[in-house]
Structures are given as C-alpha cells and as structure tokens.
C-alpha cells in the first residue's frame, strides 16, 4: 500500500479541507503575545537590518472575534530580494505558496500537516502600497468599534455558511471590507483619496474598490516602486487612526 500523500495547498485551501475548517472565535487577549513571540523568532531567523514586522488581521484588533491565526506582515527594506526570505521562514516551519498567481505577493502558512494540526500563523510580503491598506484597515478597526462589530458579525455568518471554503469566506467579506476601508480612506484623507485614485465608498462599487485597494502598486515587494512608500509608511506604522 502506498504511503499517504501530504495535503496539497492552493493558497486558500488544503486538499484535506475538513482538517482546515474555518472557526471564528471570541477575542483572545493572548494573541498579541503570540505575535510578539513569533515576530522575535522571525527577526532572529532573517537577521535583516531595517526589517519591519507588523501584527495585522483580526487578531491584531483587541476585542475582535477572529480565526485563531496570527497574521504577520513583513516590511523588508527597499532593494532587498524577497526570495531571500523563503529559506529562513521555511526553517521556522512555514510553507511557502510557490504557485501563487499573484507574483507581487508572497504568502506563507505555519501549522498545517505534516508540520502541525492546523494553521497557527500566516506571513505576508507585498509591495508597501498594498501593505499600507492592511495597516490602515487594522488601525481603523482598533479605533472604531461599530465597524469592528460589523466586521465580526460578517465573519461569523460567513464561517457558518462556508466552514471549509476559505475562498468563498474571503470573497464574502468583499463588500464589508470595501465599505469600511472606504470610510477609513476618506476620513484620514489618505493619499489615495487625495490623488483621485480612490473616490470614496459612495462612488465606487464594493468589488472595484476592494480590488483597487488590495492590488495596490504594480510592483514586486522590495522593488523600485516601493522606495517612495517606505519611509512614509514606516513613519506611520502602528499609529492609531482617529
């Protein structure tokens, strides 16, 4: 009898989807500590001067129900080849999605078989113009409990509807994410609003807005187009948005 094959990963789902179920749990005050411990391990493994490491996603918002997965955003300095991040992260137990059709982004997952019993961490690497959206969304939810509550209710409903389909779960959040992010962009007078690239939530269809925000600059992580964003983004990182 042939030995069992390890699960295959397509970026959203493993072939053993029943072992990768979506659960949205009550907020855990230990999540920031889990991030801090993993961030220190990553910083040590990469040994990259100037590296930014940010806690993003729902576990980075105090009091927000979330999937118990720590999302980590890496901000390598301009000029650094992001492919050099792969081997050290794999050494920490991360699996790199090499078949990602979006070549501007890199995605790593930790905790799935045969290395563990379920997702525990995600690591994201992307152009800084895209990273900016993640940080803005996080900081807005930290300071706007009504939007955080709306987001949590949406996630609970989608997790009940799509317990093993992460692609459908993520797609189902599009409209709410777009509305919240549109408010954040407008209220903070974000450069994307000032430049006319984004006209605000009322003038833009939800999917169009989200695709604009998630796509960001058409560049590779660490590429030349990132340079202009780097200092301004790093100066604003982790500052709450009022």
From Swiss-Prot:
InterPro entries in the cross-refs: GrpB/CoaE, NT_sf
UniProt region (Disordered), positions on chain: 215-242
Pfam families: GrpB
Family: Belongs to the UPF0157 (GrpB) family.
PANTHER family registered for this protein in UniProt: GRPB DOMAIN PROTEIN (AFU_ORTHOLOGUE AFUA_1G01530) (PTHR34822), GRPB FAMILY PROTEIN (PTHR34822:SF1)
Name this protein carries in UniProt: UPF0157 protein PA4798
Organism: Pseudomonas aeruginosa (strain ATCC 15692 / DSM 22644 / CIP 104116 / JCM 14847 / LMG 12228 / 1C / PRS 101 / PAO1)
Lineage: Bacteria, Pseudomonadati, Pseudomonadota, Gammaproteobacteria, Pseudomonadales
